[in-house]
Amino acid sequence: MKEFRGQDVLRNPFLNKGTGFTEEERKSLGLIGLLPNEVRTIEEQEVLVYEKVSTLENNLDKHLYLMDLYNKNRTLFYYTIGKHIKELLPIIYTPTIGDAVMNYSNNFDGPSGAVFLSVEHKDLIEEALKNGAKDLDEIKLIVVTDGEGVLGIGDWGVNGVSIVVGKLAVYTVAAGINPRNVLPVVIDAGTNNEKLLNDPFYLGEKHLRIYGEKYDEFIDEFVKVSNKLFPKVLLHFEDFGRSNARDILEKYRDKICTFNDDIQGTGVMMVSAMNAIARVTKKPIKDHKIVVFGGGTAGIGICDQILFEMENQGLSHEEALNRFYVIDRFGLITNDLENLTEGQKKYAKNRSDFPKDSSLEKLEDVIELVRPTTLIGTSGVFGAFSEKAVKLMAEFNESPAIMPISNPTSHSEATASDLIKWTDGKALVVTGSPSDPVKYNGVTYHIGQANNALLYPGLGLGIIVAKPSKVTDCMLSRAAHAIAELQDLDEIGASILPPVTLLRETSKLVGIAVCEEAILEGLNRENIENSKEAVLKEIYEAYY
């Protein structure tokens, strides 16, 4: 590796300590005269960083300040976030990351170590990845997006790079994935966002999105080159559009080590929540009847993961399918509707199974007809869970599970406080964005957040350690159970899922469980004698 000295050290975020360099380090690294004489510990630096963040009035400004630190001093960045994880995780990732994405081109202040690829230049993939990995250690994890399906805010093209940088930051904060072992990648395939196409400051290619054969060939080349340059790498696909996300996952999931957080991750978090809910209601997952409001990538992914769990509990494939009701913009998805995705077709109901005069367009009508035990929201439609719909859930169930998990808060189907109030405290609530505790009738209800950060960092940790040839549904199921088992549910008002303050503990448990499962399935490409020891040894700690 190249030996850095002087200004090169200060310009390298992995090496730079700012005022944290000791006198001996300043002499040996050629830093004499390049820094103020004061030497500060990382603890002293963190206090100053946090005080500065606290003075900033809005979350986007806080995000930009912290990302500036990320670009200058990676160690101090991770040390600071780790000290204030509950407060700062929503700043560096969801929900604030949505604002950062929308304002990325206007606030551009460097690439943050990301690799920028273009569908127009398939021949440059290898050169670009080599450049991005230069001066890093072994690349064990790549998070890649094409920016078409960013959170709940849609197509933001190359601005989606903020998502992959933020996602990898969460991997490090939560699971201790070494930042020198990861690579953020954004694929510029154009954009269908008219606002970006007409924005003179937009940094991406200003043409409509490329689809079809040209796009598919590019993805294929990217997958091949990534695995050639970085053998045993985990490829995490993030925020691809509905038309491509599932196709990519289905094409490659049995060929390489890959994971799609939007399809699989959200589903695993719902399995975790359902496992916890099963403990509270004394009703196993296989006995639940589920309405999913939102038939996109996340909604179908949730159905798939819970379906797998139901089959594990003894239901046949057909029996499990019959437990799901998926609602999209035209109402309940039935087999007489046109232009359904392959995922939607799988869960489409026979229209003839319902009375001819029955309305299947409104959520309330579907709830009244099928009487579900569980309602999950992935639509991104704010306020979609009406008071009438919620009260029907409470009428039909002693403890209805209601989970509006769309992000950010402005796109959530309902607020936790409304759900508790409308059900007279009966609802078991999980939300997508952080929710404050709700006080109702003398009880404080702690609201679980279906934060995928409880899953994917630990999953990645276990995968990086075991290096399996692929990521299986059984590994995801083991991860879901590990998350659910961490929470004490005996107290009234207890959160269904662990809080983000337990991210490190959760990630370790998930990592160990996934590593064990990889070995159990015989898919590990790394010889491991003790999963727990191997996982703990892999964890990076941010410190000078």
Residue ranges of each PLM-predicted region?
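N-terminal ligand-binding/catalytic initiation module
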Residues: 1-257, 517, 544
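Short acidic, glycine/serine/threonine-rich loops at helix termini
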Residues: 128-130, 152-163, 194-201, 245-251, ...
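Adenosine-phosphate binding glycine-rich loop
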Residues: 9, 15-16, 261-262, 281, ...
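Flexible, glycine/charged-enriched surface loops at secondary-structure junctions
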Residues: 232-238, 284-288, 313-322, 488-498, ...
